[in-house]
């Protein structure tokens, strides 16, 4: 391995010049990601969501090259319209971040049920809420990713990579003119949750199961998209400030969260900039947990 005489960390963890699409980029963790990518030099950050006013306020507050695009990620026509707008405006993307999600039915009270009857009642809360939870948290990972594949492939071609599907046994060719020190390829990042990995009900059964599905779908996309030169990685946040965690405490014992606190802006930004920057160019099929060690003190599988 050649040792570089100089290494600029600012360049290694930069989003300079990247075109990014992020669903749910107008609030919560999504807004934090939008802000950090904009500050790190992204050429354009398209934020998708149903509430246009929320997206517009996010774009105003963050500034830079943030572009709001109203889109229902569970509606094929709405997604197609968003893709068409971005294709018309710029023609490619480098990064797709599947971030939007919903909590679904709340089953946390099941932990404190004292009778079988109480447990049954709690587990049967809002049975109709499961379908929209899976639609937003799981199915949309595939739907949104599929919708943007053409633009992700165009992002690869822009970087000099050979486009399309490469036959088995042959390496992907590349013209490195203009990208001699940048070996990144297009990437899908799915924001899962440690709820998809633990066995403790932190939000609801539907939420945990749908996030587990999202995590596994991302892993499957890693394999499926390998011949096409598109990467797929997962970020699993723990307890972060958002509408879902509103009302929860700020400080924790070491047996709840070893770090003793909720995650913050720098915590999520650090993981994102690692994956989108040159530092993460060799990362594919990875699952990055940013939870302050919470999974280490909970019953979990990962």
Label each PLM-derived region with a short phrase.
Residues 3-10, 273, 284-302:
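Short C-terminal tail/terminal secondary-structure segment
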Residues 19, 26-28:
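Conserved glycine-rich cofactor-binding loop
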Residues 38-57:
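Conserved glycine-rich Rossmann-like NAD(P)H-binding loop of the short-chain dehydrogenase/reductase
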Residues 62-77:
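Rossmann-fold cofactor-recognition segment
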Residues 102-103, 109-131, 149-227, 239:
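Catalytic loop of short-chain dehydrogenase/reductase
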Residues 226-231, 283-285:
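Short, small/polar-rich loop/turn modules that mediate ligand/substrate recognition or access, typified
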Residues 256-268:
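A conserved structural motif in NAD(P)-dependent oxidoreductases
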């Amino acid at each position: 391995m050649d040792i570089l005489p100089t290494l600029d960390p600012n360049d290694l963890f930069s989003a300079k010049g990247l075109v990014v699409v992020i669903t749910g980029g107008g609030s919560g963790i999504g807004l934090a990601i939008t802000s950090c990518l904009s500050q790190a030099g992204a050429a354009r950050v398209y934020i998708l969501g149903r509430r246009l006013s929320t997206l517009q306020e996010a774009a105003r507050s963050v500034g830079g090259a943030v572009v709001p695009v109203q889109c229902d990620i569970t509606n094929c026509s709405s997604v197609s319209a968003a893709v068409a707008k971005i294709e018309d405006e710029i023609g490619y993307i480098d990064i797709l971040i599947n971030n939007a999600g919903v909590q679904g039915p709340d089953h946390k009270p099941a932990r404190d049920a004292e009778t079988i009857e109480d447990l049954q009642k709690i587990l049967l809360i809002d049975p109709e809420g499961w379908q929209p939870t899976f639609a937003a948290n799981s199915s949309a990972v595939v739907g949104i990713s599929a919708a943007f594949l053409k633009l992700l492939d165009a992002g690869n071609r822009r970087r000099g990579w050979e486009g399309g599907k490469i036959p088995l046994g042959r390496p992907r060719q590349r013209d490195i003119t203009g990208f001699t020190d940048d070996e990144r390829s297009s990437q899908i990042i799915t924001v899962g949750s440690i709820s998809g990995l633990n066995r403790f009900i932190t939000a609801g059964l539907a939420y945990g199961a749908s996030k587990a599905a999202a995590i596994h779908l991302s892993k499957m996309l890693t394999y499926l998209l390998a011949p096409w030169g598109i990467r797929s990685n997962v970020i699993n946040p723990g307890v972060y400030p958002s509408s879902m965690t509103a009302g929860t405490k700020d400080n924790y014992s070491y047996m709840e969260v070893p770090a003793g606190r909720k995650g913050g802006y720098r915590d999520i930004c650090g993981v994102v900039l690692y994956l989108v920057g040159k530092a993460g160019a060799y990362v594919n099929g990875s699952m990055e947990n940013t939870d302050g060690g919470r999974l280490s003190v909970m019953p979990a599988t990962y």
